[in-house]
């Protein structure tokens, strides 16, 4: 474990400006405020999903996935008390002293635990967040030595929470399978032995939120993600490749549902993979808990339904592990290229000779305010 003194934690920072490692290029910075809410993302009640309302719910879910790849669900059946306990324990964990959190430091390739910014290696710019992550399904993947032992009750609550969200995810995948004209279990079966990873995000107050992101723009690689968020706001989505962004309106008692790349491919591109990011603010902290439902590493990725007039969007079947590897390699390569281009621009600017004094004087004279006589002339 790295010494506490050498590990920067945003939750422990009282610095008035951002460290350079968190400052993003201008084209990546937020353009919409964390609390400038939009109701464009559909909110769908799951009341009656196993009864007469199923056809209507199926149509609404399919429509949301075709338009956004993201929607919110209410009346989902997950106990409100359990959700409250999960959120409380998460907040209590991030309030622990740095040395307690860093006991579970996951840097250096450890699977599960605590880290700042991201568990991905090679990122050029850090995200303004702290996370704790654990693997909960298949059950054999649970490494309790990487699960926090503080606060008290963590293990029992997160096991129950994980189980309930696995059930909700499978129910939603069943609806999407039917919308594709397939058997109810088709999407779940395509995952083979479904993985589940939970990532608890804590976004502390940020001294310069206009210069950074809590979580950079991305799509999730897996099948479906269920996000619990508090009422602060900060989740943003785009459906036009980043030209415009909206901040998703937090709704008490809801889960945000994101479709990932895997579901996008299985639907042959019919359903969008949610393009999203998280912004931060200087007023208050924000908490979110993302539960990722992913296929097994050896599950084959290929469209399950190709409609008339369509061509498969994949040339050939590949494993999910290979799909994920290609995605990460591409993202890291793009980040490296962008970093290199930025460094080259900085070197070129530093190499430019300063303007001669006569040019500076002329520019200053041009900016000098006109006299009243000149204005009225």
UniProtKB/Swiss-Prot annotation:
Family: Belongs to the iron/ascorbate-dependent oxidoreductase family.
Cofactor: Fe(2+); L-ascorbate
The enzyme's E.C. designation: 1.14.11.9
Positions that bind 2-oxoglutarate: 286
Top EC class for this record: oxidoreductase
Residues annotated as domain Fe2OG dioxygenase: 191-295
Comment on bound cofactor: Binds 1 Fe(2+) ion per subunit.
Protein name per Swiss-Prot or TrEMBL: Flavanone 3-dioxygenase 1
Role played: Catalyzes the 3-beta-hydroxylation of 2S-flavanones to 2R,3R-dihydroflavonols which are intermediates in the biosynthesis of flavonols, anthocyanidins, catechins and proanthocyanidins in plants. Converts (2S)-eriodictyol to (+)-taxifolin and (2S)-naringenin to (+)-(2R/3R)-dihydrokaempferol in vitro.
Tissue: Expressed at low levels in roots, leaves, stems and seeds.
Reactions accelerated catalytically: a (2S)-flavan-4-one + 2-oxoglutarate + O2 = a (2R,3R)-dihydroflavonol + succinate + CO2
Pfam families noted in UniProt: 2OG-FeII_Oxy (PF03171), DIOX_N (PF14226)
Pathway(s) annotated for this protein in UniProt: Secondary metabolite biosynthesis; flavonoid biosynthesis
GO BP annotations listed: flavonoid biosynthetic process; response to UV-B
């Amino acid at each position: 474990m790295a010494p506490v003194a050498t590990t920067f934690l945003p939750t422990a920072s009282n610095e008035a400006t951002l460290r350079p490692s968190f400052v993003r290029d201008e084209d990546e910075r937020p353009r919409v405020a964390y609390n400038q809410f939009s109701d464009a993302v559909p909110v769908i009640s799951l009341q009656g999903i196993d009864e007469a309302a199923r056809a209507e719910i199926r149509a609404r879910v399919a429509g949301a996935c075709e338009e956004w790849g993201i929607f919110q669900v209410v009346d989902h059946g997950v106990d409100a008390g359990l959700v409250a306990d999960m959120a409380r324990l998460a907040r209590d964990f991030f309030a622990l002293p740095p040395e307690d959190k860093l006991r579970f430091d996951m840097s250096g390739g450890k699977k599960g635990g605590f880290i700042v910014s991201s568990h991905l290696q090679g990122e050029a710019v850090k995200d303004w967040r702290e996370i704790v992550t654990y693997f909960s399904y298949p059950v054999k993947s649970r490494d309790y030595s990487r699960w926090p032992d503080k606060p008290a009750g963590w293990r029992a609550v997160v096991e129950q929470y994980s189980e309930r969200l696995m059930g909700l995810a499978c129910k939603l995948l069943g609806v999407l399978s039917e919308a594709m004209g397939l058997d109810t279990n088709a999407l779940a079966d395509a995952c083979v032995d479904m993985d589940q990873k939970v990532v608890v995000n804590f976004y502390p107050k940020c001294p310069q939120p206009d210069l950074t992101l809590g979580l950079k723009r991305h799509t999730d690689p897996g099948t479906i993600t269920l996000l619990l968020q508090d009422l602060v706001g900060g989740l943003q989505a785009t459906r036009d490749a980043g030209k415009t962004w909206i901040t998703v309106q937090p709704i008490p008692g809801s889960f945000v549902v994101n479709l990932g790349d895997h579901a996008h491919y299985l639907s042959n591109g019919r359903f969008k993979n949610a393009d999203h990011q998280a912004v931060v603010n200087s007023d208050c902290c924000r908490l979110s808990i993302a539960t990722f439902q992913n296929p097994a590493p050896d599950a084959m990725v290929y469209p399950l339904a190709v409609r008339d007039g369509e061509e498969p969007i994949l040339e050939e079947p590949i494993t999910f592990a290979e799909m994920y590897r290609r995605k990460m390699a591409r993202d890291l390569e793009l980040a490296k290229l962008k970093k290199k281009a930025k460094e080259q621009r900085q070197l070129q600017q530093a190499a430019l000779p300063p303007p001669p004094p006569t040019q500076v004087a002329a520019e200053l004279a041009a900016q000098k305010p006109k006299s009243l006589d000149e204005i009225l002339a």
